Each structure stands twice: as C-alpha cells, then as structure tokens.
C-alpha cells in the first residue's frame, strides 16, 4: 500500500509541474483533464502526508518508551504511543478507503430527471420542492446548475417533470445516491380534514456523457421542433425554438426549450440524449462486472423507495442505511451534507469489505 501511495504522490507532483506550464493555456481541454486528475489525487496525497507525519511521531514515541529510564517520562511516552497508535490506525483505514477503485463516472457532471409519481398535485409540488433542494445544495457546494427542460402541472408551482444539469467537481460521485423513489408524507394545503397524504417522486441522476463515450448515427435520429412554453421574450409561442430528439432504435427522447435559439436547444438536447444512452451503456457494464453489492446505496435502482420525508414529524429517513434525521426543514433548504455523507461512508465500508473478502 505504501508503494502505491508514494507513486500517487509522485504523480501528483508531476501533474503540478505540468499545470504550471504556460503553454497549457492554449489547450483548455488538456488543462481541464490534467486539473481534474490533479484534484482527484489531492485528497489522497494530503491524507498520506498526515499519515506519514503521525507514523514518524509514533516511531519517535516508541523509541523514547524503549530507551527512557525515568518512570514519569516513561508513563508519558506510553500514553503518547497509545494515542498515536489509534490515530495512525484511523489514518490507515482512511487511506484504504481512498485507494478503493474510483468509478470512472464519479468525476462527471450530471443530468437530474425529477418526475412526479403517485399523488397527483401533491406529487408535482414535491417535485418542485426537490428541485429547489438540489439547486440550493448545488449552490452550497459551489456547483453550477441549469434548468434544461420542464413540464408544469395544473397546480401553480408544481412540475410533472423537471430536468436539471449540475456541473462541478465530483458531482456524480456525490449525487448518484439520490437516484430512486422519494416519498413524502404531509397534509396538503387543500386538505380540510387534516389528513396526511402520501405521494412519490422519482429521481434519476445520470452522469453526463462526452461525445467520445457514445456513437450516435444521425440516421437513427428524428428531430422535431415546437414552440417554447418557457422564457424567451418575444419568441415565446411565436417561433419554434424548442427541440425534441428521438433516438429511433431505443425510443429514448431528449428535449430542450430553455435556450433562446433553436441551435442552442438542439445542442443541449443532443447532450441529454448522449447522457441517457451513456447511462444505459454504463448500467450494462456494471451488470457485466457483477458489481451489484447487497446494499442498494449506489446501484441506482430507480424503482426502489430510497427515502421518506415525513413533514408532521419533521423526519427524513433513508431506508437503504436506516439513517434518520429530524432536521427536515434544513434538508429541504439544501442541507443534504449529513445524509449524503452517511451514504458515502456506508458505501465505502461495503466496498472495502468486498475488497478484503
């Protein structure tokens, strides 16, 4: 393990030198690739540095314990050795987790599809609530988000469907745990008897594909244009700027109406289509690798009920790991860190267990 960590440290230094090369400014694609790789290694290098410092301190304390004759000093050295041994063991465990094989897609940006399910108007309102939750979480993480497409419901403020693009560092690696069915239990504003209604919204988190990931034949595509129902000033309902693309072999559809020109909407819709096809390809690869563990945390099973938001009890429960929080208002404002961190830690523990078997 130490040899592997040393090699990573040297690679990190090489990347640092490469990124300082002024000529790299002329090749933005290579710069982004190197910078992403550099960022991915930084956490491992920092953890390894901390491990090495504490291991050196432990060695010095053990030497003092072995050579010291003064009783009081020996007792102090013994206490320090015990404390440092515990710290070094924790850091070593952390390094083992960091060295787990990274999923290639983890560093990708994402497209999130949020769809109202059972529950009618209440489900569409909760779809809007989840949209705001993810937008605020993205803001807290320093990520960028953009609405690509949406379908409003009959109730004001509700959505039958919302499609978001979120871009930033390690977005899919963080957001992939959100795929699945989110259930809400609350009393609708229109409920005169005060009865609790249960509704559901499905969330699909897809790693954004690059052009090289998926080959799409133009002959397999059908392009339709229609009038945008969203923003666009004088273009609204007058010019067909919205674009819908259908991939004929699979029947997969991607649409975008949020850009101001037909060309921009077409480019966005193509990106969404590539992402959907890449997601299918990725799922097939994961299945072939038999990488489906007992836990459903990262399998992305979108038919599985993953979380319940109980408003009367101000409770959020993630059913995959038995996690419960009574900070529902804060979570709905984007404070998802505690939930996602618990899911990541559980997933890492399961993967480490699998690696050691």
Curated annotation (Swiss-Prot):
Family: Belongs to the prokaryotic/mitochondrial release factor family.
InterPro entries: PCRF (IPR005139), Pep_chain_release_fac_I (IPR000352), Pep_chain_release_fac_I_sf (IPR045853), Prokaryotic/Mito_RF (IPR050057), RF-1 (IPR004373)
One GO location term (cellular component): cytoplasm
Name of one Pfam family that matches: RF-1
Disulphide bond pairs: none
Keyword annotations of the record: Cytoplasm, Methylation, Protein biosynthesis
Molecular function terms from GO: translation release factor activity, codon specific
Protein name: Peptide chain release factor 1
Modified residues (N5-methylglutamine): 234
HAMAP family: Rel_fac_1 (MF_00093)
Its biological purpose: Peptide chain release factor 1 directs the termination of translation in response to the peptide chain termination codons UAG and UAA.
PTM remark: Methylated by PrmC. Methylation increases the termination efficiency of RF1.
Segment forming the signal sequence: none
Species name: Chlorobium chlorochromatii (strain CaD3)
Compartment annotation: Cytoplasm
Matches recorded under SUPFAM superfamilies: Release factor
